[in-house]
Structure formats: structure tokens, C-alpha cells
């Protein structure tokens, strides 16, 4: 179907989230919370002591949506549309695993995930004025056993470097994911069933 008019702001630079919104026919305008000059609105993405992976990802997604409202208000002269934000993290034995800092960190993460199942948690939030609605998607991913050579070659592609858990389910990593239980789109970064529910709550049509 044709993409609808731009009814929401998307507070995310993720091309995967933009692609998924287009997939369900939702037009949107991109909000950049922090530009190339490192100017913008800060969001604390550091896990807090005692914070569960679910609480962490929900807190960060809400903070992104709230920051997006501020950016949108400044940019649009006070005329604001609903802001959609999301955040994804990996939980391995309830330990939060985010994006790798560098190739060495990506190696460590993939070695930890190798041959084991882990949980991918994505929170999606829509904020408008004083209203905030949230949904959380949890999926289980089983990773095949990865030898050091495969990990090294995969990291050399650059694909893991901006991904939670150091892999992209829709990319080359699909070759070593043996089983998924849950939301494929949620693992990509935007659970579409939950997103459609949120959009409907704000009377925004999709699909």
C-alpha cells in the first residue's frame, strides 16, 4: 500500500526501524536526538544498578520519546506530532548486553552468545503531549556454535558494530541463528504487532 502522510515523528536513526514503519504503511519524519557534531538531547543509556533488562529497555525508550518531544517542539515551532521511539537490548542470563564498543567487545559478546539461547527485548513508546503509551516485546533467539574464524570474519564485515548483541538478524547473522521464538520484527528493533497497537491507541492508521 502507499505510504501515508507523515503522521508521526520517529526518534531513531535506525534504518531498520524506518524500513519497518514503511512496511506497515506509516509515514514518518525523522528526529535526530544528537547530530554529527554531537549536539542535541542526552539520553542516559547506562544500565542502573539492580535494573532488569526489561526495566532498562523501557526506561531508555521512554527517555528517547520524551527527548524527541523536546526536539520536535523546538524544530516545529511548538506544533508537535506523536513521537515514536524504541530501544532494544539483549539479555543473557539476565545480564544486559548492548552494542559493542569495538571489535574486541563484539568478539567477547559473540563468544558469549555462541551455542546458547538469549532473549531480545524491545520496548516501543509513543508520546504525545502528556500522554505516554508503551509496549514491550520479548523474543528468544538460539545461536549456533560459532568458531573463532567465523566470528572474526563476521566482525570484519562491520555489521555487528551498531547492533545490540553484536549481530543483525536480518543480515549475515541469519546464517547462524538456528531458532527464533517470538517477534522477528522485534528482534530487528521494532515489534510491528505492538507498534500497530500503539498507533491505533493514538488513532493513527497503519497496514
Show the residue positions of the predicted features.
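Acidic/polar active-site rim loop that often engages polyanionic ligands
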Residues: 40-46, 92, 130-137
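GST superfamily/GST-like fold recognition
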Residues: 1-26, 116, 138-207
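Short, active-site-adjacent cap segments at secondary-structure transitions
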Residues: 17, 89-92, 97, 127, ...
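Mobile beta-alpha loop/short-helix "lid" or hinge segments that flank ligand
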Residues: 27-40, 123-131, 162-174
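Anionic-ligand binding region
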Residues: 107-113, 123-134, 138-139
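N-terminal polybasic phosphate/anion-binding patch
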Residues: 1-82, 95, 196, 200-207
Amino acid at each position: 500500500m502507499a505510504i501515508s502522510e507523515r503522521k508521526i515523528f520517529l526518534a531513531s536513526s535506525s534504518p531498520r526501524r524506518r524500513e519497518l514503519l514503511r512496511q506497515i504503511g506509516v509515514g514518518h519524519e525523522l528526529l535526530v536526538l544528537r547530530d554529527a557534531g554531537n549536539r542535541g538531547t542526552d539520553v542516559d543509556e547506562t544500565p542502573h544498578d539492580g535494573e532488569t533488562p526489561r526495566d532498562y529497555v523501557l526506561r531508555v525508550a521512554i527517555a528517547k520519546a520524551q527527548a524527541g518531544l523536546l526536539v520536535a517542539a523546538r524544530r516545529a515551532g511548538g506544533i508537535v506530532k506523536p513521537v515514536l521511539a524504541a530501544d532494544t537490548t539483549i539479555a543473557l542470563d539476565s545480564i544486559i548486553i548492548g552494542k559493542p564498543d569495538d571489535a574486541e567487545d563484539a568478539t567477547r559478546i559473540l563468544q558469549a552468545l555462541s551455542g546458547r539461547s538469549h532473549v531480545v527485548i524491545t520496548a516501543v513508546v509513543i508520546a504525545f503531549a502528556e500522554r505516554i503509551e508503551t509496549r514491550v516485546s520479548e523474543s528468544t533467539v538460539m545461536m549456533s556454535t560459532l568458531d573463532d574464524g567465523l566470528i572474526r570474519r563476521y566482525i570484519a564485515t562491520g555489521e555487528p558494530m551498531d547492533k545490540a548483541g553484536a549481530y543483525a538478524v536480518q543480515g549475515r547473522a541469519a546464517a547462524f541463528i538456528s531458532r527464533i521464538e517470538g517477534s522477528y520484527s522485534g528482534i530487528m528493533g521494532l515489534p510491528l504487532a505492538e507498534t500497530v497497537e500503539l498507533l491505533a491507541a493514538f488513532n493513527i492508521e497503519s497496514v
